[in-house]
Amino acid sequence: MSEWWKEAVVYQIYPRSFYDANGDGFGDLQGVIQKLDYIKNLGADVIWLSPVFDSPQDDNGYDISDYKNMYEKFGTNEDMFQLIDEVHKRGMKIVMDLVVNHTSDEHAWFAESRKSKDNPYRDYYLWKDPKPDGSEPNNWGSIFSGSAWTYDEGTGQYYLHYFSKKQPDLNWENEAVRREVYDVMRFWMDRGVDGWRMDVIGSISKYTDFPDYETDHSRSYIVGRYHSNGPRLHEFIQEMNREVLSHYDCMTVGEANGSDIEEAKKYTDASRQELNMIFTFEHMDIDKEQNSPNGKWQIKPFDLIALKKTMTRWQTGLMNVGWNTLYFENHDQPRVISRWGNDRKLRKECAKAFATVLHGMKGTPFIYQGEEIGMVNSDMPLEMYDDLEIKNAYRELVVENKTMSEKEFVKAVMIKGRDHARTPMQWDAGKHAGFTAGDPWIPVNSRYQDINVKESLEDQDSIFFYYQKLIQLRKQYKIMIYGDYQLLQENDPQVFSYLREYRGEKLLVVVNLSEEKALFEAPPELIHERWKVLISNYPQERADLKSISLKPYEAVMGISI
């Protein structure tokens, strides 16, 4: 099989917020089809489509009730088949979201499973007796807060759910479950789907003795090491590869929650025949206070040195073994320039700076819809947020446990809430940013009149065209894909600089990720190199990259000549 995914750039679509073709306020598959030429113009090769399968939408489609049919608001299977064909006509590929750690509680399998203890589908899920006092089987927590166990009156047992109680976890120990999953994968791949992004795949293998976490009793329920990397994880993925993936020329990326580099090597070492890539979370947690009862909502200031060290550890750790994904944004993360940068006066420079850091690295870049026009976090009030995670966290942290004040929580949500990524795509300065002729399912970002696709395409200096050029450079220079990576100036608190080397060529990336001026001094071994500037986000007069006085958020990429 070819390794086309190494040279690809992926564009992620969150369909409910991308483009609404029928005016019901909800993005749809025909809307995606209508905007394919826009994505092609950007230069992306692969579209990753967030879940479109039938679902009660408790967790925006990550709770699937039917893996072989579309959710009606997105369209029909015929619309999906048309989308696959239209993507392929343009020389692009399409990857779907595979959500098989859990289903919806409205899936036919679970409806059967909960009927009785001897139902043939009982072992499709994880059922346990209560403790003698009637409480949960153990102290495992749900990632969406509260217990990971919900009591079912009908059969007097608890079922396990790492996410919401409407997302019961599948029992991967049961071979019949695995066969069902492989059948779903073949169904879509036989119709042209080019691969999978595998949702929380790191959690499919459970510690089936269900041990309690040790606790200091500050928290009733705990999310920790037992929630991922279970004893049969890699056995299951190797079986999936053997049974399904190895029969197709496809791309696979696993959401590997709880993985360190050693775990990542197991997933991505080609000789092990598992997955092509994984998403790591480590660099996205640099602004989270570790071991806080408030989890991701206990935020600390952006620390560039920590970001550099973390990203470098992954760049060097997987070198010659596996392959990295490169991302700052997706449907679960806020807008990077609002989170770690400047989304006002220096918005354009800042967006281009973060893009330069990412696209100059080794790995497959993922662009999230709106990132390429510099979309920013929303300023909507707390009561207008739709996300289940936010609602549950508010109840647990503010109302019940009182570990955060409402003011502290609101401030954290304004920085890190997932809905910042989920507001509608901003197409133009017209009503609802051109997303819909109806009423949008979630409010449009108030800054859409200044930040939109139409404005971006009319401005040759826009963030869109900068991304387009970064992608073009990646196609032109193999060093951007295959070059080795070396961090420079690791303890500089303002400048992210690194060197790539490939077959005698050198690529230098220098980015000021601060609002102040900064200085880059080339290390001695680069003093005599001559450079050609490939791209920069300020007008460039210089030809010499040995010593650079950098403006706020200035980014320069040069190649040796």
From Swiss-Prot:
Keyword tags: Calcium, Cytoplasm, Glycosidase, Hydrolase, Metal-binding
Residues annotated to bind Ca(2+): D20, N22, D24, F26, D28
Broad class of where this protein is predominantly found: cytoplasm
Pfam family of the protein (one): Alpha-amylase
InterPro entries linked to this entry: Glyco_hydro_13_cat_dom, Glyco_hydro_b, Glycoside_hydrolase_SF, Malt_amylase-like_C, O16G_dom_2
Similarity comment: Belongs to the glycosyl hydrolase 13 family.
Record SMART domains: Aamy
Record-linked Gene3D superfamilies: Glycosidases, Golgi alpha-mannosidase II, Oligo-1,6-glucosidase, Domain 2
GO BP of this protein: oligosaccharide catabolic process
The enzyme's E.C. designation: 3.2.1.10
Thermal dependence of catalysis: Optimum temperature is 42 degrees Celsius.
Name used for this protein in its record: Oligo-1,6-glucosidase 1
GO MF annotations in UniProt: alpha-amylase activity; metal ion binding; oligo-1,6-glucosidase activity
A GO cellular component annotation in the UniProt record: cytoplasm
Function as written in the Swiss-Prot or TrEMBL entry: Hydrolyzes various disaccharides such as sucrose, maltose, and isomaltose with different efficiencies. Also hydrolyzes longer maltodextrins from maltotriose up to maltohexaose, but not maltoheptaose, palatinose, isomaltotriose, or isomaltotetraose.
Catalytic-site annotation from UniProt: D199 (nucleophile), E255 (proton donor)
Enzyme class, UniProt record, top EC level: hydrolase
Catalytic activity: Hydrolysis of (1->6)-alpha-D-glucosidic linkages in some oligosaccharides produced from starch and glycogen by alpha-amylase, and in isomaltose
